[in-house]
């Protein structure tokens, strides 16, 4: 008997949702950084064994939106509640429950689907603090289970996976066993470039960046995958920061991104990056759609 099911990973920004998904999948399919709102699109991670398939849906961190892009991200996250049988509500062990958590809890109560509370980053707290955190969240709503984990170190992750597989119902294998995500390579390439911008820049720059892969094809002469990508920003000052003195920052972004892209593709890569200004793109629906943030996603 084959079992399958869809599981959403929900929570505030920076609680470790993407770190968890990458750990489960055994490779990077969702980019990570210490900046809030790193994940902007829903990303499927397809976990398949001989007897079961769990389709995880990593979602953007739920926050109070200030732009049309923010609206898109929050609606995209909540839309998964219509697509799944179980929700992993992830919270950090080293932070107290806040208004953002309470807002999510109200939506989860209304959704009326099983919710597992996943308390991440247990490596950062004393066990007594963890018990207080569990009691506090349990006072707010009824959870199917509570599972403390460290996504970074992998502590207790197998326990969570076993809990999910034990509760799967008989179903189809929705995706081939060798498919690990629903997104095409172009999307993953653009995300890997954006991740390097997030790591290397500060303040408003990371939130103002989108990456569009203009072309991606193999050059038969050099046997390399030739990629042309444009980094979009909202202001000339941001363009200057990303290019850097004599192009040094852009070169660094390209070099770091190329390494990750080569690992993913298993091929040598020639990466060309450009920077363009598109004023206030985060508040323009047409620009959002052009850059891959399309309302059709929810």
Swiss-Prot record:
Main location: cytoplasm
UniProt-listed SUPFAM superfamilies: P-loop containing nucleoside triphosphate hydrolases, Prokaryotic type KH domain (KH-domain type II)
Annotated stretches, region: G1: 11-18
Region: G4, residue numbers: 120-123
Pfam families referenced in this protein's UniProt entry, alphabetically: KH_2, MMR_HSR1
Keywords tagged on the record: Cell membrane, Cytoplasm, GTP-binding, Membrane, Nucleotide-binding, Ribosome biogenesis, RNA-binding, rRNA-binding
Molecular function in Gene Ontology: GTP binding; GTPase activity; ribosomal small subunit binding; small ribosomal subunit rRNA binding
GO cellular component: cytosol; plasma membrane
One of the protein's GO biological processes: ribosomal small subunit assembly
Record-annotated KH type-2 domain positions: 201-279
Segments for region (G3): 58-61
Family statement drawn from the similarity comment of this UniProt entry: Belongs to the TRAFAC class TrmE-Era-EngA-EngB-Septin-like GTPase superfamily. Era GTPase family.
Stated name of the protein: GTPase Era
């Amino acid at each position: 008997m084959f079992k399958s099911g869809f599981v959403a990973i929900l929570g505030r920004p920076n609680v470790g949702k993407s770190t968890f998904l990458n750990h489960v999948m055994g490779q990077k399919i969702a980019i990570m950084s210490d900046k809030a709102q790193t994940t902007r699109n829903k990303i499927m991670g397809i976990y398949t064994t001989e007897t079961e398939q769990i389709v995880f849906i990593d979602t953007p961190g739920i926050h109070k939106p200030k732009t049309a892009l923010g609206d898109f991200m929050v609606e995209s996250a909540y839309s998964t509640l219509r697509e799944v049988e179980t929700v992993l509500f992830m919270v950090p062990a080293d932070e107290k429950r806040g208004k953002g958590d309470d807002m999510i809890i109200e939506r989860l109560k209304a959704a009326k689907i099983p919710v597992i509370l996943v308390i991440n980053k247990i490596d950062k707290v004393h066990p007594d603090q963890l018990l207080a955190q569990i009691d506090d969240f349990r006072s707010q709503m009824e959870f199917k289970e509570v599972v403390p984990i460290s996504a970074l170190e992998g502590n207790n992750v197998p326990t969570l996976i076993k809990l999910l597989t034990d509760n799967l119902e008989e179903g189809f294998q929705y995706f081939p066993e060798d498919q690990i995500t629903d997104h095409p390579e172009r999307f993953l390439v653009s995300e890997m470039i954006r991740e390097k911008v997030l790591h290397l820049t500060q303040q408003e720059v990371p939130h103002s960046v989108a990456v569009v892969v203009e072309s991606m094809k193999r050059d038969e002469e050099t046997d390399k995958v030739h990629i042309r990508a444009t980094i979009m920003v909202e202001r000339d000052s941001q363009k200057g920061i990303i290019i850097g003195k004599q192009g040094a920052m852009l070169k660094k972004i390209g070099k770091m991104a190329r390494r990750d892209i080569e690992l993913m593709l298993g091929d040598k890569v020639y990466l060309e990056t450009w920077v363009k200004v598109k004023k206030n793109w985060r508040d323009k629906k047409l620009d959002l759609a052009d850059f891959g943030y399309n309302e059709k996603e929810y």
